[in-house]
Amino acid sequence: NKIAASSDYDNYKMLKQTARERGVKFLFETNVGAGLPIISTISDLRGSGDRVLKIEAVLSGTLNYVFNTLSADIPLSRAVHLAQENGYSEPDPRIDLSGKDVIRKLVILARESGYRVNVEDVESNLFIPQALFDGSLDNFWAHLPELDAQFEAERQRLACENKRWRFVAEWADGKGRVGLREISQGHPLYDLEGSNNILLLTTERYHEYPMLIQGYGAGADVT
């Protein structure tokens, strides 16, 4: 029901209203962060009178796995293959690489935080050329290795600067954006391992030190 919860805003409100009218629960906790208590925590905070001001998160276990797997011996194309082989990505990994899944998750979190937002309102920056998304899946696999050298050169540069790639979803000042960011050492997102997810929640109460929720974010066992 991730698609339903991130569909047109009026449809999302209708789903929740219908559930209330019929006395049933509309549960979708695992839509974001697998088994992590993210949606319920936001609901509890708002229920207590708090207000969400900013969301900063890594919400794709697949993409985090890919960028954590990159090395001198494992180029981008191989890392994407490994994500698929290990069950982290969709059968068509372009769904993950496009960031569309992360956009849906951010929309859900923003809505649960009390904001009116639709998928098309979120700014997205692709790190894979659009041409690889437009063709067939076979075409994607055939041309993905063409990006390996570029990503390896950038990976080496980041390593020298003590930075790491993270695909970050952010909601701030009433606007949403997702994209690949260079994260410096010392930032909470820097040491995120494997396919883990992390969320930093800035609220009126948790303002100076945002609330942090972190843990496994992909895989059938936790979803």
Where are these regions (language model features)?
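A short glycine/serine-rich beta->alpha loop
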Residues: 25-28, 51-52, 91-93, 210-217
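Short, basic, helix/turn surface patches
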Residues: 24-36, 54-60, 119-127
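Rossmann-fold NAD(P)-binding glycine/threonine-rich loop
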Residues: 2-29, 34-43
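Substrate-binding/catalytic subdomain of NAD(P)-dependent oxidoreductase enzymes
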Residues: 69-70, 78-191, 196
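Rossmann-like dinucleotide-binding core of oxidoreductases
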Residues: 32-33, 42-46, 50-82, 92, ...
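Catalytic, metal-anchored helix/loop core of enzyme active sites in primary metabolism
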Residues: 54-59, 64-67, 82, 173-223
